[in-house]
Design a protein with these regions (language model features):
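Residue-level signal for inorganic ion chemistry
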Residues: 59, 97, 119, 199, ...
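Structural signal for hydrophobic packing residues in well-ordered secondary-structure cores
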Residues: 84, 88, 105-112, 116, ...
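Terminal low-complexity tails and localization/encapsulation signals of metabolic enzymes
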Residues: 1-65, 99, 103, 151-178, ...
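ALDH superfamily catalytic-core signature
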Residues: 261-408, 437, 471
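Rossmann-like NAD(P) dinucleotide-binding subdomain of oxidoreductase/dehydrogenase enzymes
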Residues: 153-299, 428
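Conserved C-terminal structural/oligomerization subdomain of aldehyde/semialdehyde dehydrogenase
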Residues: 1, 60-63, 226, 251, ...
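Short, well-ordered beta-strand elements within core beta-sheets of diverse protein domains
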Residues: 61-68, 85-89, 177, 288-292, ...
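Glycine-rich loop-to-alpha-helix module at the N-terminal edge of alpha/beta enzyme cores
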Residues: 60-152
Length: 513
């Protein structure tokens, strides 16, 4: 996994070096109503529920799928259980399992343009973002975890007396995985790859607004005939389908990325069913602190902007609260306003476009309501603050990049997750003051700070209440480093060995001699 933001690439948005969108192919592929994938077969739902998917860039229907109900979830869980208990996957040699995962990685790369096209049609993000970020990373994470299959060890416990005690980690079993709308194929891969690497089987549900790239991924794997039936299962639908997963007695673990509100419900579902472990990657309101001794101030301001406004701000770890020292506050606000005003919104397949459409009309309206709240509470709109309906954008769900200045940290826009292109710029005077404000949040996913003072960097990083802290470059992610938050930003970690551990159950074995 590479650095999340390349400023030159973000500013240019060219298709140089990547395949062109496969729009005609996608149009034909989307003609048929899509089905869930259970036990190696595509099945229609027993109910008559059909979901329509809308292109956020123009408000037009692009395709549909059958919603899965309780019967389909039951069948998927039964197939996954059989594949785990009786099938070859959990008992397969690690070398062979790694080979299959490398094949999946290669297949994703081979079909990269197809998957990116579906992602952009479904989600509204730029094609360059779908291609270079989402699909590329999905391929990379399968390759990364393929390398872990034969490198995961147990422990020899230093117990007292005439005993030998060892600890093993076994596959946890059938995993329910619920994926969000903002990075559909990427988040699916984040969850599928470590689960499969440890020998588990999966029932995965994509977001109802953005299901098509996951459907195509399962098609690609199915066509390659490389996984035994039942190892991976795909159930389509809305929150009710997700509830069947989270409450199911036959599922051994649930992992979820999405809102804190839904995360709480999944915890209740676990308590009301079989107390299955739950991994949660939830909301964020990440603080980004710009001290007046920041190295290369212009780049720090620019990166603070792009760290939020790529992927149209629909990012849980986005630095949505920018705390700026009062000595440089006006300069930062003016530059941020210039960047926001320069952004071109429109067709996400147009290489000149800087920002695509919000995922749905409902989500756009939610963002606009937050913007109105900011205005009413006294924040000053520096740029944006409205829907973009210019030209062909009239029917799309576009929100101008919005910069709020003179924000008080207690305002609604500074405390609640907006999940859109809205930045709160908050002044501060002292180090202790800004640490207190940064930590004044129910969330604790990410945080950033910019300073030339090494002592300050270390001191502040230790005091920030967040699962990830970025010093002098916000948004540095790598599969080798854990991704996840504190407080109400979730439980558990994605990436590295930490994700693998969450897909295992630990056993201590004692020998007397």
């Amino acid at each position: 996994m590479v650095e999340a933001i390349n400023l030159k690439q973000v500013s240019e948005r060219k298709f140089t070096g990547i395949d062109q969108p496969k729009l005609e192919w996608a149009k034909n592929w989307l003609k048929n109503t899509k089905k869930s994938y259970v036990n190696g077969k595509w099945i229609e739902a027993s109910s008559s529920s059909i979901f329509e998917s809308i292109n956020p860039a123009n408000g037009e229907k692009i395709g549909s799928f059958y919603g899965a109900g309780k019967d389909e979830v039951d069948k998927a869980v039964a197939a996954a259980r059989s594949a785990f208990d009786q099938g070859p996957w959990s008992k397969m040699t690690r070398k062979k399992r790694a080979k299959i995962m490398h094949e999946i990685s290669s297949l994703i790369s081979k079909h990269q343009a197809e998957l990116a096209t579906l992602e952009t049609l479904d989600n509204g993000k730029l094609y360059t973002e779908s291609y270079n970020d989402d699909v590329q990373e999905a391929s990379d994470i399968f390759a990364y975890y393929a390398g872990w299959t034969d490198k995961y060890y147990g422990e020899n416990n230093p117990v007292e007396g005439d005993f030998l005690s060892i600890t093993t980690r076994d596959p946890i079993g059938v995993c329910g995985q619920i994926v969000p709308f903002n990075y559909p194929i990427d988040m699916a891969a984040w969850k599928l790859a470590p689960a499969l690497a440890m020998g588990n089987t999966v029932v995965l549900k994509p977001a109802d607004k953005t299901s098509f790239s996951a459907i195509r991924l399962f098609e690609i794997i199915d066509e390659a005939n490389i996984l035994p039936p039942g190892v991976i299962n795909l159930v389509l639908g809305d929150g009710s389908t997700g509830s069947y997963i989270s409450r199911h007695m036959g599922i051994d673990k649930v992992t979820f990325t999405g809102s804190t509100q839904i995360g709480r419900q999944l915890v209740r579902d676990s308590a009301d069913s079989n107390l299955k472990p739950v991994s949660l990657e939830l909301g964020g309101k990440s603080a980004n602190i710009l001290f007046d001794d920041a190295p290369n101030l212009d780049e720090a301001i620019d990166r603070s902007f792009y760290g939020l406004f790529t992927h149209k701000g629909e990012k849980c770890s986005a630095p949505t609260r920018l705390f700026v020292h009062r000595n440089i506050y006006d300069k930062a606000v003016n530059r941020l306003g210039e960047l926001a005003d320069s952004y071109k919104l429109g067709d996400p397949f147009d290489p000149e476009t800087n920002q695509g459409a919000q995922v749905s009309e409902e989500h756009m309206e939610r963002i606009l309501n937050y913007i109105e709240s900011g205005k009413q509470q006294g924040a000053r709109v520096v740029a944006g603050g409205k829907r973009d309906t210019d030209g062909d954008n009239i029917n799309g769900y576009f929100v101008r990049p919005t910069i709020f200045a003179e924000v008080n940290n207690s305002m609604k826009i500074a405390q609640e997750e907006i999940f859109g292109p809205v930045l709160c710029v908050i002044p501060f005077d002292t180090e202790n003051e800004v640490i207190k404000m940064a930590n004044d949040s129910i969330y604790g996913l990410g945080a950033g700070l910019w300073t030339n003072d090494v002592s300050r960097a270390n001191r502040v990083a230790k005091k920030l209440e967040a699962g990830m802290v970025f010093v002098n470059k916000y948004g540095c992610y790598d599969f080798a480093s854990p991704f996840g938050g504190w407080k109400q930003s979730g439980w558990g970690k994605e990436f590295a060995v930490h994700s693998l551990q969450s897909y295992t159950k630990q056993k201590a074995i004692w020998f007397a001699y």
